[in-house]
Amino acid sequence: MKYNIVFKFNVEGIVDKPDVIGAIFGQTENLFGDDFDLRELQDKGRLGRISVDLSTSKGRSEGTIIIPSNLDKVETALVAAMIENVDKVGPYNAEFKLIDIVDIREEKIKKIIGRAKEILGSWSREKTLDIREVINEITSSVKTGELTEYGPERLPAGPDVDKDPELIIVEGRADVINLLRYGYKNVIAVEGATGKIPQTLVDLTKQKKAVIAFLDGDHGGDLILKELLSSNIKLDYVARAPTGKEVEELTGKEIAKSLSNMVTIAQYIKKQQEAQQAIKQALATETTTTAVTTTSTQIQVEVKPEEKKEIQITVPAQIIEEIKKLPGTLEGILLDENWNIIEKIQVRDIVQKLENISADSIRYIVFDGVITQRLVDLASAKNIKMLIGARIGGINRRPKELELLSFNDIIS
């Protein structure tokens, strides 16, 4: 069957289900010839069994009727109109009213879409081989884990942080949610630690065979790693997101690749020292060259501080309430000039949305994610006035006409 035709009916008297069904057959018989007679259509399998749900009260009868249809849309609509034309059940006046025509195939479509998502999830998850087998267990399942809170500090974590011999440390709640989406359940967040790593996390790492710090590929990730290295936490490996990217926005393939490219702490520190030494040598060479070419003439230039345009935008109370609901959802809200909600959208779709809109059509964006340089540049090009995100990443170019705020600026 393709459709369910749903009616409501009222009868000005007490009747039974067979009376209702008989009235439908009797008053529609031969209206459009034998080929479109309801009994004939049932015999041919074009219509299903008529289902009647009936109740009586105060001398009246009312209820609903469902008729399955395997006809096309035009024929199904014609059947519906025929039944609405029924005005008697037995000796009593009656009214039949169409409520809905339900497409039964929608349920099948939903099941197909659900299965397609499962297939895509297992396909997207890249399986990697690693001789250290540090990520062997966390790549064995594609089922999204349940977000939990760990310890008295209520650190966002996956369900396997206690029982798995390996542990992945990330920065924030959104990072944990993204890794859970791709099946990594032994993950825990430091929640933007500022100067002190939670003692719960310190104690947890000492119980683990291997501990991996998996951090953003920006300056914020550098700061978190510096805090981890300066604490007494047990840390064995470092993995970084691609340069300029956040862990929370990585795909399953990018996550697997980043983890497979992790290095030991000793290797990481050595690379950092080599990079710093190269910078020092470059600066020393530049200083020497400058000293040789500089003349005795000195020019003094008065440098005036850059004038910064002040932007004062008041966030309405109803939008602040919406912001309070966003943490952990990975969702965003697009708003117009008057702070009216235009659309609610997944964070991962915001950049693509902005690329396809005209300038001035969106004026404010609130979202549960990191404000990146790419998003700032795109928002500026579209004349957006304000970005409000869960966190502000490393921004090198900040347009004067665009205001950037974090959730903490709004709801702290």
UniProtKB/Swiss-Prot annotation:
What CDD domains is this protein classified in? TOPRIM_primases
Domain Toprim, residue spans: 165-243
Taxonomy, superkingdom: Archaea
Example GO BP: DNA replication, synthesis of primer
The record's comment on cofactor binding reads:
Binds two Mg(2+) per subunit.
Q: Which coenzyme or cofactor does it need?
A: Mg(2+)
**What name does this protein carry?**
DNA primase DnaG
What's the source species for this entry?
Sulfolobus acidocaldarius (strain ATCC 33909 / DSM 639 / JCM 8929 / NBRC 15157 / NCIMB 11770)
The upper taxonomy is:
Archaea, Thermoproteota, Thermoprotei, Sulfolobales, Sulfolobaceae
The coding gene here is dnaG
